[in-house]
Amino acid sequence: MSFFRYLSDISSETRTLLLAYGVLGGLYLILVPLALYWWMNRRWYIMGKIERLFVYGLVFLFFPGLILLSPFLNMRLKGQGET
């Protein structure tokens, strides 16, 4: 039985529900953590206290997605340069 035949046997409500779960899962596990990585990398040295607290809260909220993406991203902060 092919995948498309199996998919055609599923009701439209179930397909809509699966699509909604897929979109929300993609947002939670990939899209928002990527945006959070980008934001932290861009603003790390110029964040204020409130912004840093907000970003740490988002890191706590989207931790599973950040862990999934961490092996593929190298976001090391700038060091002191050569000593």
UniProtKB/Swiss-Prot annotation:
Any one cellular-component term (Gene Ontology): organellar chromatophore thylakoid membrane
A Pfam short name: NdhL
Catalytic activity annotation: a plastoquinone + NADH + (n+1) H(+)(in) = a plastoquinol + NAD(+) + n H(+)(out); a plastoquinone + NADPH + (n+1) H(+)(in) = a plastoquinol + NADP(+) + n H(+)(out)
Chief subcellular location: plastid
Sequence intervals crossing the membrane: 17-37, 53-73
Statement: the UniProt record of this protein carries the keyword NADP: yes
Keyword Translocase: yes
Organism superkingdom: Eukaryota
Gene Ontology molecular function terms on file: oxidoreductase activity, acting on NAD(P)H, quinone or similar compound as acceptor; quinone binding
Localization per record: Plastid, Organellar chromatophore thylakoid membrane
Membrane topology (UniProt): Multi-pass membrane protein
InterPro entries attached to this UniProt entry: NADH-quinone_OxRdatse_su_L
Disulfide bonds: none
Keywords, alphabetical: Membrane, NAD, NADP, Organellar chromatophore, Plastid, Plastoquinone, Quinone, Thylakoid, Translocase, Transmembrane, Transmembrane helix
EC number, UniProt record: 7.1.1.-
Signal peptide boundaries: none
Family the UniProt entry places it in: Belongs to the complex I NdhL subunit family.
Biological role: NDH-1 shuttles electrons from an unknown electron donor, via FMN and iron-sulfur (Fe-S) centers, to quinones in the respiratory and/or the photosynthetic chain. The immediate electron acceptor for the enzyme in this species is believed to be plastoquinone. Couples the redox reaction to proton translocation, and thus conserves the redox energy in a proton gradient.
Oligomeric and partner information: NDH-1 can be composed of about 15 different subunits; different subcomplexes with different compositions have been identified which probably have different functions.
Official protein name in the record: NAD(P)H-quinone oxidoreductase subunit L, organellar chromatophore
